[in-house]
Amino acid sequence: MSESVKENVTPTRNFRRTQGPQNNTKPHNDRKNFRRKQKKNNLSAEPNLTTSSADDTDEENELCVICARKLTYVSLTPCHHKTCHICGFRQRALYNKKSCLICRTENEEVMFTDRIDGDISDKYNFCEKNEKYGINFTSEEVATETLNLLKFFCPLSKDEQVCDFGSFKKYNEHLKSEHNRMICLICATHKHAFPCELEIFTQNQLRNHQTKGNSEGFKGHPMCAFCSGKRFYSDDELYIHMRNQHEKCHICDKMNPASPQYFKDYNQLFDHFKHSHYVCTVQTCLDNKFVVFKDELELQAHILQEHGNILKGKPKFFQSELSTFISAPSRVIRERDDYDLPSISSLPGSSSGSRTDVRSASSPEESRLRLAERAKYYLENSKEDFNKFSSYNEDYSKGRLSAEKLLESYKLLFTKPNADVYLLIHNLAETFPKNSSKYNNLNAIYEQREQTLARQTSLPSLSSDSSLSMSIGRGHWGGTNDGGSAGAALGVRNIKNLPTLKSPSASYDPFATTVKKNTLRPVQNIKRTTPQSVSYRTSTNTVAFSPTYLESKKGSSSTSLNNSKDKLKSLNLPQLPPPKPKVQIPGLNRPQIADPKQWGKKSSTQDTNVHDNLRELNTTSGGNKKKGKQKQLLFHIGV
């Protein structure tokens, strides 16, 4: 049989030997020695393979399929699966789960035994049963070894000093005080490990463990960048902490989800919003928080959709709330409808005309800084003028200057066209308490100015120059005749539109009675024997032109018309300037157009006209120049 084995074994050819000389022949000698040993042991090769396979099977049966430890005590489940007692007890004691580790079947009770080859279907005598974890123990030894896994024994103490410390905190204090050692409390809390499984470190070892980790793949416990010295078991716990305790920019998260940006609190996040994104500065959105957009286009769309009411009828410029200086206060968008006046009579008592922006109430320190910044801007950073400005404010605060005197001083100091002294008055008022007399005096000046601006913006007042004042009459300028129906109706209709008039009573109806209208006859139908006369009446400032042919007969009017006329007179309306008289200048020479039918025909009148023209030309040329050639008309075309 050995000869047959020798015949079957054929040496394999090494092709590297044909490529040239080899410098090192040691690998070749090793292969030759290996082949000799293999030839000698070929007879006993088959029995050795059988023995090794049996040993491997026994070793696999003695190892836990979960942790690969050698089985000392086993956990048998009703689903006929077997694990070590440590893995089975960890599932029930630390994870609080009763499912099988292999097939995930829920098992209310399992069995812990020292019979490694046993099966759940065999008969066992149970000596102890733990109701809390649902475990049946077949021996006291198994029960003791299993339940001792939960106890806090110190492995560094002597046998007679071993005791249960009851918690990780007391166990760590004992290690630190007695042995100058400690455990990682982060691992003890989150690792789901028994106390005896936790590694014991020195101070430096613990620091390296938490910051650097180890060579087995553990990279250390991550630390929160905002909470000093606070570390977490893994990135999952750190993410939960950052989500609950800190703020994340959702705009940056959308643009780059791989690297989200976190901030300590909302104040830091809002600073990031202001510098990196576009914030809606309307007060309602500032109160709601997180109203921020990626670009300016989205911000404008939000303002038009959510705050369109503050843009209707208002200036088209939007001033940011974040700056403490406003260059043009009249162009700031306000939340309230400052220019929608319900009636003229409500202006003195109303405060809706104030130029209040949407900035929330600021502190006195911010108001002083805003006042100083605006004053320096108006004074072009003149130190001397700013010292005067500060002295005026100090005199007013100490009572040496009244509010009116302060306003006059401001007007003399701030002479630039862009300087708004009333806005400075308003800023100075904000530095005083709201209920103080100094605040009320300054604010009264500011409110009065705002009402005037609002009135001018609503409807500009008419000119009240005495040189342009004229009474309104029917077909008569500058006279004292009774007003016509059209003028009366126009005056009554425009009462509410004039800012200087008093509002009529609600019960008065200018359209209650009808007014009889006298229609004017056409001028060409009036027959007169005498030429029309035009009367002129001169005054100091105006010229009254009243054509007599426009005078209509004075008819009796209704009582309501007289009443309305008296009311118009009592209103003292400003008189309108007189219109310039229309002058029609007639033409000097009336053109004579020839009949087209007579063109080309001889007529005596045409010949006589031609000869007359020639005679005139000869006469004029002969008078001017007695000698020389005379111009003659050779032919005449057209007219």
Curated annotation (Swiss-Prot):
Pathway in which the depicted protein is active: Protein modification; protein ubiquitination
Organism domain of life: Eukaryota
Comp. bias regions, Low complexity: 343-354
Sequence ranges assigned to domain LIM zinc-binding in this UniProt record: 222-292
Enzyme Commission designation: 2.3.2.27
Modified residues annotated as N-acetylserine in this record: S2
Main location as per UniProt: cytoplasm
Gene3D superfamilies, per database record: Zinc/RING finger domain, C3HC4 (zinc finger) (3.30.40.10)
PANTHER family from the UniProt entry: E3 UBIQUITIN-PROTEIN LIGASE ZNF598, ZINC FINGER PROTEIN 598
Protein name, entry field: E3 ubiquitin-protein ligase HEL2
Top-level taxonomy: Eukaryota, Fungi, Dikarya, Ascomycota, Saccharomycotina
Gene name, Swiss-Prot/TrEMBL: HEL2
